[in-house]
C-alpha cells in the first residue's frame, strides 16, 4: 500500500498532461536540431547595465547535432576569432593574435566566450535531454513548464533550469538558469521564429545575465538549411583560414 501511495502521484501527473517531461525534452532537442545542416550570418549585440552596445558579426555553421563552427568577422579586434565544437564535447578556440588553436579544457568550458553572455559550453551544446531529467511543473494556454535537473554524474554549473516549451512547435520560449545556491543567474529567450523549408528555426535569441545586468542578443540573417555542408568546414585547419 505504501508503495502504491508513492507512485500514485506520478501516475496521475502523467495522465494529467498526457506526456512526460522527458518526452517533451526529447521533442525539444529533435526540433532544435531538425535541419541536416545550416549556415548563417550571426549578429551579436552586447548590452551592458548602462545600455551601452557593442556589435559583433560572425559566420556560423552547424552540421547535425554535434558539429558547429563560429568565425568572427567584425569588429577588427575580434576578426578571425573562431570556435569549433565537435562530437563528445570536444571544443577548440582560435585567437589570431596567438596564431594557435587551443583545445577548450574542461575547467574553463563554463567561462564566458569573447565577452558575450554565452559560455563555451553554451555554444557547443546541442541539446538538453542528454544531460538533464525533466518534470512538468505546470502549464498555461500555450506552454508546458518544465523543471530540468542535471543527471547524476554530469558536470553543470546550474542547480536546475526552468523551461517554457511551446505546445505546438516544441521550441523553448524561455529558459531560466539557476546557480548552485538556487538564485536566478541567466535567462534565455527565443524572440523570433521563421519557417524555413518546413523547419521552425529561431532567428532572434537573447541571453541575459541577471547578476551582471548584461545581455547578448543574437540575430541570424541569410540563413540557409540543408545545403550539404562539407565536413572540411568543421576542422582545426579551417579555423585558421
Regions found by a protein language model. Name each.
Residues 2-10:
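Sec-dependent signal peptide recognition
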Residues 10-18:
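Hydrophobic h-region of N-terminal signal peptides that target proteins for export
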Residues 19-96:
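N-terminal mature ectodomain segment of secretory-pathway/periplasmic proteins
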Residues 23, 52, 123-135, 182-187:
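A short, amphipathic edge element
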Residues 72-74, 95, 138, 148-150, ...:
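Short, structured patches in soluble enzyme cores that scaffold and shape functional sites
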Residues 95-122:
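Acidic/charged, solvent-exposed loop-and-adjacent secondary-structure segments enriched in E/D, K/R, S/T
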Residues 100, 104, 124, 141-236:
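Gly/Pro-enriched, hydrophobic low-complexity segments
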Residues 113-149:
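Short, conserved active-site entrance elements at the starts or edges of catalytic domains
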